[in-house]
């Protein structure tokens, strides 16, 4: 009985190990990703969508062909256009909606009023957690490069924008999936151009 108890205690406190970081974007092609080829393209070492000349007609997503569970994701991004309307985001623990251009899952949001926030796309359709306006005023950079770090471990989700922790969220709904694809978004409804690069992921696992 004592041996079993010690095992349960040990197993409950297993350290989380990170694999070597892997790049999800080769800087030249969209290999490993799937999406509307009329929307998504590669320019100067970045994944690009949208336009500064015409409004983006609808939400579009570029999705990984692989699914992920626990991980730490780092993405460098830039958003341009109408500052009040331009919006984008990085989806994770997400799935494609069959026969539809939309996806469903968590999003690290980008844009006026949403910087650094955790949004639930096409599911609960609301901001789940986010930083104060004062934090965003000091952290977010429109029309310049920004860094998002997204860390998922079990039901814990943390977001960092340019090194500042903006979300520390615990998902209480056990029905919400803890695995899924990663996707890049350009939001419809405004003149928006979004660029993503330096996309790396470290998959996390418990030490045996």
Q: Each predicted region: which residue ranges?
A:
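Carbohydrate-interacting regions of secretory-pathway proteins
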Residues: 18-208
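Positively charged n-region of N-terminal signal peptides that target proteins for export
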Residues: 1-5
